[in-house]
């Protein structure tokens, strides 16, 4: 009887295919699963299974996304592929499918097209750290010089958006050829996965980041003090550690955690993913409210003015029926609370239509603990009309 092989938990990375319509994103996804399935590292998924992605709702926004998973020798990947361009825009802006890296698919026969460029820009805006390029359909291009020109153009486009265009790996291949089992092209898919393994960085584990917990509720326990409850988003907290309570006021409150509670049990520490109650020394119940965050001192600051990349829900998604203009004043929902803010559209933008994505500037009436990449919803009277994330902090 053979011994069970020792399974080491491989590190997990979220990845996705991006690029222009019909450049071969879905065929490539199918080819990756097909080739890795022969090594026992994936379940093969056919083109139609990926392309017929079911609709999902993320914060009221309808997105078609296909999820496949596979492994390489070193890592476990969750891979997203979206059938339509609008699905990508929504996915990236809402962070419905968090991407630690991306495979940019460019057809060698076309070169970078408008959506190629838009996806690169969006990836930069939403903080995708690195991408690997798959130059697809090279079997349809006889001219070596043309391939070189396309490669130069892709590298320039990446550099323009803040990626390291000069050092980004570009793999030349044919997804269709690989799917048909042609050895030459199968090898290029293997090269692609090697490049993804080595060039896309491992994401930091949430527990290793500075402590942050969003306050959902506050109550006082007679004789013990004030308890704030919420979900620990990142980091860990131990009894006796100092914290700051940030947001909805100009300057943070300082306190010390004197107890960590989960499911009515007292613990020594809480960590990312836990729903916990923190007992806070020297803080009155009236000083804390939902929407504040409890953090490692100095790790995050409150701000009112920021730029954001936003997707505005279409009428069919339950969004607005009419466009909005400069000085629009909705509520911005961050983590656990709504704050009113005034919108300033970019110069040259008259209005924003339902179904659009745009970059805009917001001035909140109260400060929120904020950092680049923070997600928010735009609401009117409790109804979600948009979603976005902070791309730059202004004040």
Swiss-Prot record:
NCBIfam families: EF-Tu (TIGR00485), PRK00049.1 (NF000766), PRK12735.1 (NF009372), PRK12736.1 (NF009373), small_GTP (TIGR00231)
EC numbers for this chain: 3.6.5.3
Binding site for GTP: 19-26, 81-85, 136-139
Sequence segments annotated as region (G5): 174-176
Region (G4): 136-139
Reactions listed under catalytic activity: GTP + H2O = GDP + phosphate + H(+)
EC supergroup of this enzyme: hydrolase
Record Gene3D superfamilies: P-loop containing nucleotide triphosphate hydrolases, Translation factors
Cysteines paired by S-S bonds: none
Keyword hit for ATP-binding: no
First-listed, main subcellular location of the protein, grouped into a coarse class: cytoplasm
G2, as annotated region: 60-64
Localization (cell): Cytoplasm
Pfam families noted in UniProt: GTP_EFTU (PF00009), GTP_EFTU_D2 (PF03144), GTP_EFTU_D3 (PF03143)
Binding-site residues, Mg(2+): 26
GO MF entries: GTP binding; GTPase activity; translation elongation factor activity
Protein name listed in UniProt: Elongation factor Tu
Region (G1): 19-26
PROSITE patterns: G_TR_1, G_TR_2
CDD domains, sorted: EF_Tu (cd01884), EFTU_II (cd03697), EFTU_III (cd03707)
A GO CC annotation given for this chain: cytosol
InterPro entries cross-referenced by the UniProt entry: EF-Tu_GTP-bd, EF-Tu_GTPase, EFTu-like_2, EFTU_2, G_TR_CS, P-loop_NTPase, Small_GTP-bd, T_Tr_GTP-bd_dom
Quaternary structure, from the entry: Monomer.
Keywords, comma-separated and alphabetical: Cytoplasm, Elongation factor, GTP-binding, Hydrolase, Magnesium, Metal-binding, Nucleotide-binding, Protein biosynthesis
């Amino acid at each position: 009887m053979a011994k069970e092989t020792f399974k080491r938990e491989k590190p997990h990375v979220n990845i996705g295919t991006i690029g222009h319509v019909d450049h071969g994103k879905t065929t490539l996804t199918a080819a990756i699963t097909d080739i890795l399935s022969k090594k026992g590292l994936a379940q093969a998924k056919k083109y139609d299974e990926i392309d017929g992605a079911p609709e999902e709702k993320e914060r009221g926004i309808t997105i078609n996304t296909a999820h496949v998973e596979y492994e390489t020798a070193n890592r476990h990947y969750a891979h997203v592929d979206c059938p339509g361009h609008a699905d990508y825009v929504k996915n990236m802006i809402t962070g419905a499918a968090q991407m630690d890296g991306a495979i940019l698919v460019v057809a060698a026969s076309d070169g970078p097209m408008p959506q190629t460029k838009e996806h690169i820009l969006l990836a930069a805006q939403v903080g995708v750290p690195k991408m690997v390029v798959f130059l697809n359909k090279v079997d349809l291009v006889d001219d070596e010089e043309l391939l070189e020109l396309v490669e130069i153009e892709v590298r320039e486009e990446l550099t323009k958006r803040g990626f390291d265009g000069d050092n980004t790996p570009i793999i030349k291949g044919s997804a269709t050829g690989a799917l048909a089992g042609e050895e030459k092209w199968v090898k290029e898919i293997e090269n692609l996965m090697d490049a993804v393994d080595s060039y896309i960085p491992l994401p930091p584990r949430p527990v290793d980041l500075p402590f942050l917990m969003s306050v959902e509720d506050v109550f006082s326990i007679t004789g013990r003090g004030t308890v704030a409850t919420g979900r620990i988003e990142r980091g860990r907290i131990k009894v006796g550690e100092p914290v700051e309570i940030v947001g909805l006021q100009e300057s943070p409150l300082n306190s010390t955690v004197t107890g960590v509670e989960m499911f009515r049990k007292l613990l020594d520490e809480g960590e990312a993913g836990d729903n916990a109650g923190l007992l806070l020394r020297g803080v009155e119940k009236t000083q804390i409210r939902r929407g504040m965050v409890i953090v490692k001192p100095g790790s995050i600051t409150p701000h009112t003015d920021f730029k954001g990349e936003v997707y505005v829900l279409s009428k069919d998604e339950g969004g607005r029926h009419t466009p909005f203009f400069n000085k629009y004043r909705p509520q911005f929902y961050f983590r656990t609370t709504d704050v009113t803010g005034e919108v300033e559209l970019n110069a040259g933008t008259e209005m924003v239509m339902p179904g659009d994505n745009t970059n805009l500037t917001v001035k909140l009436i109260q400060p929120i603990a904020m950092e680049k990449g923070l997600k928010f919803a735009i609401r009117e009277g409790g109804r979600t009309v948009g979603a976005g994330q902070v791309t730059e902090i202004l004040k």
